[in-house]
Swiss-Prot record:
Keywords: Aminopeptidase, Hydrolase, Manganese, Metal-binding, Metalloprotease, Protease. Pfam families: Creatinase_N (PF01321), Creatinase_N_2 (PF16189), Peptidase_M24 (PF00557), Peptidase_M24_C (PF16188). It catalyses: Release of any N-terminal amino acid, including proline, that is linked to proline, even from a dipeptide or tripeptide. It comes from Colletotrichum graminicola (strain M1.001 / M2 / FGSC 10212) (Maize anthracnose fungus). SUPFAM superfamilies: Creatinase/aminopeptidase, Creatinase/prolidase N-terminal domain. It comes from the Eukaryota. Binds 2 manganese ions per subunit. The keyword Plastid does not apply. This is Probable Xaa-Pro aminopeptidase P. It is an enzyme of class 3 (hydrolase). The gene is AMPP.
Length: 617
């Protein structure tokens, strides 16, 4: 991994801080829309620190610099940060959070500055409280982003890619129905308007897809929805005639992206109140808890704003019948591509003894996926990792500088694709030679956790927080664990990481119960730093299941797995599996064989590999 000398960049940033009387400057990862994955023009934290992981926050003082990130990226950050940076390993004992570290640095009446478009109102409030408790002066919102000024002309331009309509056969629900349901929520909340800032929520609401952020079919935009209007703020040059006509037919007004804050000021000053569709007078605005501090301030702050878990996000997370059918279908096609890839890779490495590096292998997988029906692109950077690289949880192989795949070591491939009918995310760990007993033990424990969660049945109202331990239990018995969540929501031809649901130990996963129609990943793992990494990831849908009893008159839920890729027989230790686990595995493999074999009628190499990997234990 490349390590960048950040000395000059930090020096220039500190000059700008001094000019503005700022002693501590916070640089979050997110863009103005709280996006997890961002466009190149918004990669400010990466530019200033050299750390390219998707999660983290940089904090710079006049003489120090710190980068905070979670356990997924400890290994990567330690390799990418230069001598100017302190790594704050979030979640470890006695390690301060970035907010705590920022507050500590503000002691003695110092000023903390931030771009208010890049943090939420709640984070701003908490940080302000911490700063003042530590003896700092205040948290100050700055009109200019100081990293942008350092970046100057080298900063990439904002993308202007075309926006297209997603046909209703894929979306399953028309725009007018979605707007009607959202307005009913405005009524229930007695809100004057909902200002929408999350890009995937806007794409879902209007059944549109774009290409402004790599791997995420979204576009830079805001939306304001009232009881009688819907306005989309977007660069109009991205809209073709068909998309313009479609929006007009759905009574959606289009205005320039850059004037959204002007429109908010006009809306605030136009009336002191308005009538909701139920006739109730309302003065308050509704925004998502993920909306920016700048947006909240422009709407009048706490006195005029209700911050809520987005009703659009809640609706989007519950897939309709068309979306669920699409997820099933695209995972079969995607599974076929992965099966062909793994058969090809084994043949190249073992039979033909070809030397392939990690990127060359990933390129082949992308080529195979691109042949599938309704393929659009990848859903994230493919993690193609051999040996010790597999222990880097979010490893990204670099073209021309990555490792040659070692057929005698573990190979981990975490990859996904965007299709018009759904989004995929699959991880498989393979070994093309003779794995060690330790590797087989770890793999089988991870597999047992995957099966335990896949087969779980739980009452309605259960959260992902409550069932996370099912995936970890077998590792825990051996004193092992992993430093990442067990599952995340998955969008329908949208972001591969989708809230508000998930499975993990974070408090946020205790806030929203799992519901039929939710689509999540199930991905336990184990990582031996410097040696190997193991992860097994499937995508599954929450469905209602029939039980003999119904305690508390509650329906009971379970999972339907949609990923159709075999597990690595070479890494399974059968003696560690129960009879029930073996039966589940055999049935699942038979299902995979039945649903994918039709793709390989003229491909004996792949068919032979598939038959071998799916034969009963």
């Amino acid at each position: 991994m490349e390590r960048i000398d950040t000395t000059g960049r930090l020096s220039r940033l500190r000059e700008l801080m001094k000019e503005r009387n700022v002693d501590v400057y916070v640089i979050p990862s997110e863009d103005s829309h709280a996006s997890e994955y961002i466009a190149g023009c918004d990669a400010r934290r990466e530019f200033i620190s050299g750390f390219s992981g998707s999660a983290g926050c940089a904090v710079v003082t006049l003489d120090k610099a710190a980068l905070a990130t979670d356990g997924r990226y400890f290994n990567q950050a330690s390799k990418q940060l230069d001598q100017n940076w302190l790594l704050l390993k979030q979640g470890l004992q006695d390690v301060p959070t970035w907010q705590e570290w920022s507050a500590e640095q503000s002691a003695g009446g110092k000023v903390v500055g931030v771009d208010p478009e890049l943090i939420t109102g709640s984070i701003a409030k908490k940080l302000t409280e911490k700063v003042k408790r530590s003896g700092g002066s205040d948290l100050v919102p700055l009109d200019e982003n100081l990293v942008d000024l350092v970046w100057a002309e080298a900063r990439p331009a904002r993308p202007k890619n075309p926006i297209k309509v997603l046909p209703e056969k894929f979306s399953g629900k028309d725009v007018k129905t979605k707007l009607k349901e959202l307005r009913q929520e405005l009524d229930r909340k007695n809100s004057r308007a909902f200002v929408v800032s999350m890009l995937d929520e806007i794409a879902w609401l209007f059944n549109l897809r774009g290409d402004d952020i790599p791997y995420n079919p979204v576009f830079f935009s805001y939306a304001i929805i009232t009881s009688d209007s819907a306005t989309l703020y977007v660069d109009a040059s991205k809209l073709g005639e068909e998309t313009r006509a479609y929006l007009a037919d759905n009574d959606v007004c289009v205005k320039p992206y850059d004037i959204v804050f002007d429109s908010i000021n006009t809306l605030r000053s136009s009336d002191t109140s308005c009538q909701t569709t139920s006739g109730v007078s309302s003065k308050r605005f509704m925004i998502s808890t993920k909306a920016s501090w700048a947006l909240k301030r422009s709407l009048g702050g706490d006195s005029q704003v209700d911050e809520v878990r987005s009703p659009i996000g809640d609706s989007k997370a519950v897939k309709n019948k068309s979306e669920m059918a699409g997820m099933r279908a695209c995972h079969i096609r995607d599974g076929a591509a992965l099966i062909e890839y793994f058969a090809w890779l084994e043949d190249q490495l073992v039979a033909k003894k070809v030397k392939l590096d990690e990127v060359q292998a990933a390129d082949k997988l992308e080529q195979l996926r691109s042949k599938q029906k309704d393929y659009v692109g990848l859903s994230f950077d493919t993690i193609s990792s051999t040996g010790a690289n597999a222990a880097v949880i979010h490893y990204k192989p670099e073209r021309g500088a990555c490792s040659i795949i070692d057929p005698t070591a573990i190979y981990l491939c975490d990859s996904g694709a965007q299709y018009l009918d759904g989004t995929t995310d699959t991880t498989r760990t393979l070994h093309f030679g003779q794995p060690t007993e330790a590797e087989k033990l770890a793999y089988t424990l991870v597999l047992k956790g995957n099966i335990a969660l896949d087969t779980a049945i739980f009452p309605k109202g259960t959260t992902g927080f409550a069932i996370d331990c099912l995936a970890r239990q077998h590792l825990w018995k051996e004193g092992l664990d992993y430093r990442h969540g067990t599952g995340h929501g998955v969008g329908s031809y949208l972001n591969v990481h989708e809230g508000p649901i998930g499975i993990g130990t974070r408090v946020q996963f205790a806030e929203v119960a799992l519901a039929p129609g939710n689509v999540l990943s199930i991905e336990p793992g184990f990582y031996e730093d410097g040696s190997y990494g193991i992860r097994i990831e499937n995508v599954a849908m929450v469905t209602e299941v029939k039980t003999k009893h119904s305690f508390g008159d509650k329906p009971y839920l379970g999972f339907e797995h949609v990923t159709m890729v075999p597990y690595c027989r070479n890494l399974i230790e059968p003696n560690l599996l129960t009879a029930e686990e073996k039966a589940w595995l055999n049935a699942h493999h038979a299902d995979i064989l039945q649903k994918t074999k039709g793709y390989f009628q003229d491909d004996p190499l792949t068919m032979t590999w598939l038959a071998r990997e799916t034969q009963p234990l």
